[in-house]
Amino acid sequence: VEWSSNERSTITSLWGKINNAEIGQVALARVLIVYPWTQRYFGQFGDLSSIAAISGNPKVAAHGKVVLDGVEKAVKNLDSIKATYTKLSQLHSDTLNVDPDNFKLLGDCLTIVLSAKFGAEFTPAVQAVWQKFLSCVISALSRQYF
């Protein structure tokens, strides 16, 4: 993937405003609430029986931060996203057996959370660059499946 200087700037500028713990928790909670079948991967998280339980679950919060910390690796390695995610893709496909469609669901929820957080700053132009970036991340995470 080729990144223009404007795209690089847009991604790093947006990412610089993101609190990984805050956004990660809200995005992962949204996935678990909106797509309840994804909860099957998180049985060790305890109570996921309601919106309040999911939103207040410390394990959801902690893993949400882990997820965003992982996305941050792509931000810092825009020219080698696939290589950056090789081991993580293997883990999710070979060990955790995560359906790769769930990466898209998480990306969609993350985009919604960012739009809500940043409002008018999250312009269509910013979203277009963000979607390109997320597509690369999702492709890299799904790489071991195919």
Curated annotation (Swiss-Prot):
It comes from the Eukaryota. Heme b binds at H63, H92. The keyword Metal-binding applies. The keyword Iron applies. SUPFAM superfamilies: Globin-like (SSF46458). Belongs to the globin family. Involved in oxygen transport from gills to the various peripheral tissues. PANTHER family: HEMOGLOBIN FAMILY MEMBER, HEMOGLOBIN SUBUNIT EPSILON. Heterotetramer of two alpha chains and two beta chains. This is Hemoglobin subunit beta-1. It comes from Muraena helena.
